[in-house]
Amino acid sequence: MSSRFARWAPGALMVAALALDAEVVRAADAAEPGAGTAPAEVAAREYEQVMGLTPNLANGAKVYLTCAVCHRPEGWGSPDGDYPQIAGQLRTVLIKQLADIRARNRDNPLMYPFSVPRVLGGAQEIADVTAYVSQLPMTADNGKGPGTDLELGKRLYAENCAKCHGDQGEGNAKDHIPAVAGQHYLYQVRQFDAIRAGRRKNADPKMTRQIHGFTPREESAVLDYTSRLVPAPEKLAKPGWLNPDFPHYVRPPMPGFPGPSTTRPAASAPATR
């Protein structure tokens, strides 16, 4: 990566991002193809277009600079649940979610301004950045749950989740079902609640039905268990690894994310509804 990209501090880029006010976003929307078409159809067309392109990893690293502001240069997100670990995620999943967000088939007000074509780029940039992110090594130091009901969580996962997400949480690239191994517990809680409440427009209806009757205890147990599934060894970063494509990037402290070698307290269970 060019040093002029790597030297950017995240604060400077965040200030630039905040300049994307409502007028700019409306202008981006007006320029997008498919106006008046159902968001799911727009996203599906872009997904197919991206899948037909050959990715350029070097350009993907440059595009990823925008993403690193929130997801960090390593793609590890934040254990407080604000940002997911996207490093090592299945590429088909990354493409689908990005296409859904920019087509507004998935509501994500924080990420949407970063995803619009005039900021992120077109289909080629999606091809490039998703290929880049999918090959980043993961951290096993993701946020975990309270650790109090793991046997129940294991049983619930086997009965309700493993068929789609895989026995080890590895996901399914063909059906763009995300890998959940190594994902932050609190991020999973947030998405679980959004899916069950119908706030995730692009959620699989089968999953919405599957989790509808979960009690707060069951939710905490299964997501705690899932957060402790460890990705395959070849997908994990070595101790002390930092993304070499961002050698001068200023990595600010992030709440709840002390670093790869530091032990953090487990999260508490979600509040009873």
Task: Write out the residue ranges for each language-model feature.
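Bacterial N-terminal signal peptides that target proteins for export
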Residues: M1-A12
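Axial heme c-ligation environment in periplasmic c-type cytochrome domains
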Residues: A28-A30, P79-Q85, I101-L136, D141-T148, ...
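Electrostatic cytochrome c docking/interface patches
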Residues: A31-Y64, G77-D80, A131-L156, Y249-F257, ...
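The canonical Cys-X-X-Cys-His
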Residues: G60, C67-P73, V129, G153, ...
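Long hydrophobic alpha-helical segments typical of transmembrane helices together
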Residues: E218-R273
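C-terminal segment of classical bacterial N-terminal signal peptides
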Residues: A17-R26
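Gly/Gly-Pro-rich "capping" loops immediately C-terminal to redox-active cysteine motifs
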Residues: V50, L57, A68, R72-R106, ...
